[in-house]
Amino acid sequence: MKNIAIGILGAATLGLMASAASASTLDTVKAKGFIQCGVSTGLAGFSAPDDKGDWQGLDADFCRAVAAAVFGDGTKVKFTPLSAKERFTALQSGEVDVLSRNTTWTINRDTALGLNFVGVTYYDGQGFMINAKKLPGVNSALQLSGAAVCVQSGTTTELNLADYFKANKMEYNPVVFEKLEEVNAAYDAGRCDVYTTDQSGLYAIRLTLGSPADHVVLPEIISKEPLGPAVRQGDDQWYHIVKWTYFALLQAEELGITKANVDEMKNSPNPEIKRVLGQEADTKIGTDLGVSNDWVVNIVKAVGNYGEIFDRNVGSGSPLKIARGINALWTKGGLQYSPPIR
């Protein structure tokens, strides 16, 4: 879900940002010995605590990848659950070092909030879920005129919903809540006919409902929701480390480097693989970035490549079973693409 920044940042917020940016994030992180990662309050497949209280998901694993790049140890990360309303302030103030919380990259957030998005870890789009028993025969969002629709307030989801119904000359009754947990509970209790959010979120939320099989995700996608991690503006070194961690995950998948074979691949005769894994004698890619030259080895050992992260958290190896689709590599018809690591 995505919070909308309304109005102009106040002087107090700007002061917090200036204070947070006064020291190098890398130095601060190294001094405390871990990365503080802002995640959701609980979204299956992306960031949610398991039965042992350990955070799991694509967004959580991305922060582990950053920790592995910096420390050589993917466990050196602590997670801070943040609501949609809290997330940007937490990053601006320095409460978290990285925000990896199913957040949509928009022009306002990129230019007005003092944030830098590092890439798109998940290409998503807004969709609709219905209780098929309450709305028998409905198989398209264009059949939802007059429906009560549950939605989280202060989000791009809320705005997209209004635009979609207006554009299609339909009426609807918005049932609005501030917290995601409240939206989930209201929909499950039957207070609305329809639930709208990112389609990936709908698949995750469906698993938590009382009777998951009764609920159907409709085929329409009504928006572009490029979800990705963000860092504070003003610290280029930290931005580069986090950004190239994302690209390293993609490059590892493209080159066939996995958690299981990364040590073996260090002996590959392929010059590109040797360069990416820091095995060339004169390589300084890692040290120029501010980490060790075997930073990609450490990342892959900790979490695997991008494809492995996707599959176990949201894809074929997860309860969500979401197809790769446009999140496949560019070589397989998708949008995921890394610039050269050289």
Q: Language-model features: where?
A:
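Sec/Tat signal peptide C-region and signal peptidase I cleavage site
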Residues: L16-A23
